[in-house]
Each structure stands twice: as structure tokens, then as C-alpha cells.
């Protein structure tokens, strides 16, 4: 019986694993020879994007704990200021635009505290799971892996795949794609 996961990042990872197979389940095959390379670039870019809102989520909650009596207006100002700081540090060098507030668009950070980083970690976990699942019996492995229950994240992924939880496989795959 499937029995819990270490945290919501692992739930997101499993959702990503199944989403990857949605067209396949409908009998639609993508024969594009560049598909694997494009998938890797897409995963890296998606993680880069969600990391920004994840950092903002964490920063906003740190700010709220430091300012427990803040008004809604002060929170709004802080969210906008923090989003600009994160944008300017991590995104402006890539996009060439400063003081963008697009990272502040996610209302999740208030309604579902500290959830957004689960997406970024979920993508790292998914990448490791996909590498492991490649060429194996999907149903049996998913059943085996997700029966482990609520272990610490690194113990869980190590028992699932034999490797520590790390972004290294993603970076290695990206380097390979960029070389080609």
C-alpha cells in the first residue's frame, strides 16, 4: 500500500512523473528526435522560473515573522520590494530588465505557506526518479518506491534510486545538451 512521502515535494515529483506520460497514455507518441534534449531544457528552465517564486515565498515569510504586526499594505510593499530584489539578483542578468515584479504574482505564498519550493524540489526529485525509472517496469517501481513512507528526503530518494538527493544529474544532463 502506498504510504506517505517525506514532504509535498515528493507528491509534486510523482505528479510530474505521471504528467510526463499523459500523451503516451492517450496513444499519442512524440517522434521528435530532439524531444529528450528539449525536455531537459524545459525542466531546467521551469525549475529556474519556479525557484524565483520559491525564494520570494521564503523571503516573505521571513519578513512576516520579523514583522508580526504588519498591515496588509506593508505586506504588499514588502512582497513587491523582495520580488524586485530577487529578480535583480537572479533574473535581470539573464533577461536584461531590472525591477520586475512578476515573481510576486503567486498568491500561493500567502494562502499555502512555504509550498512553492515544493515545486522546485519536486522537479529535482522527478529528474532523479525518471533517470532511475528509465528501462524499468514503471508500475512495479512506482509501487515499490512510494511504499517507503515518510522517511527523511535523502533517505527516501536513496532507497528509491540508490543515489543521494542532488541537482547534479540535472546539471550533467544540461551540460550534455548544451555540448550537442
Residues of each region from the PLM?
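C-terminal, non-catalytic "cap/extension" segments appended to globular domains
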Residues: 9, 17-20, 24, 50, ...
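ATPase nucleotide-binding head domains, primarily ABC-like/P-loop NTPase cores
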Residues: 1-2
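Post-HExxH zinc-binding segment in Zn-dependent metallohydrolases
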Residues: 5-45, 122
Amino acid at each position: 500500500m502506498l504510504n506517505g512521502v517525506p514532504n509535498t515535494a515528493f507528491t509534486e515529483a510523482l505528479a510530474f512523473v505521471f504528467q510526463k506520460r499523459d500523451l503516451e497514455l492517450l496513444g499519442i507518441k512524440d517522434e521528435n528526435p530532439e524531444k529528450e534534449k528539449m525536455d531537459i531544457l524545459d525542466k531546467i528552465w521551469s525549475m529556474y522560473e519556479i525557484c524565483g517564486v520559491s525564494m520570494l515565498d521564503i523571503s516573505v515569510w521571513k519578513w512576516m515573522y520579523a514583522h508580526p504586526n504588519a498591515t496588509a499594505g506593508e505586506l504588499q510593499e514588502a512582497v513587491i520590494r523582495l520580488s524586485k530584489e530577487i529578480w535583480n539578483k537572479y533574473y535581470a542578468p539573464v533577461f536584461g530588465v531590472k525591477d520586475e515584479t512578476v515573481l510576486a504574482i503567486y498568491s500561493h505564498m500567502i494562502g499555502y505557506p512555504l509550498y512553492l519550493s515544493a515545486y522546485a524540489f519536486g522537479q529535482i526529485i522527478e529528474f532523479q526518479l525518471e533517470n532511475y525509472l528509465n528501462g524499468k517496469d514503471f508500475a512495479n517501481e512506482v509501487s515499490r518506491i512510494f511504499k517507503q513512507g515518510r522517511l527523511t528526503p535523502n533517505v527516501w530518494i536513496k532507497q528509491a534510486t540508490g543515489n543521494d538527493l542532488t541537482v547534479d544529474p540535472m546539471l550533467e544532463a544540461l551540460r550534455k545538451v548544451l555540448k550537442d
